[in-house]
Amino acid sequence: MIKVRLQIADGEIKDTASEYGLVYLSADSRFAAPIKGFEKSSYPEQPGTNLDPKTVDDEFEYKVKFFVKADGDLENANQKIAAFNSLLYTKDADNVKTFKQVTFYNDYKKAKIVGYPTPIAEATEFWRDSRGKQADVVCVEWTINVNNPTLCDFNI
């Protein structure tokens, strides 16, 4: 099994499979953050454009696919996902959610991704048992919204 780890806010770094029941399947194959577009200007009497070659890294989304072992009962997967999602934010009296910054360590692809998570809201696939009746495994996709790419490291 491929090991990936997660730190929520300033908490302890934990293995996603043993701690949350999320077994790593795949993730984006990103070697660097995208760059913001170059600033350009052009004039009708001038051929081409003027281009300022200075730019910085831009925000991006990092997608991770996990499977959740349901052990023949979809309710088990629902409970694991709900428990995981509840760790990602705090909620005030008015039901406003404030998301915590997460640090995702993809030891397989040697990347450290820092950003704000989107909760897991739906399954991408259900894998059934050999009789086609029970959901043994539920596949989900999780997104980390990277707002400050300078915190990420693509060579850990």
Language model: regions and residue ranges:
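Extracellular/virion structural assembly segments
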Residues: 1-156
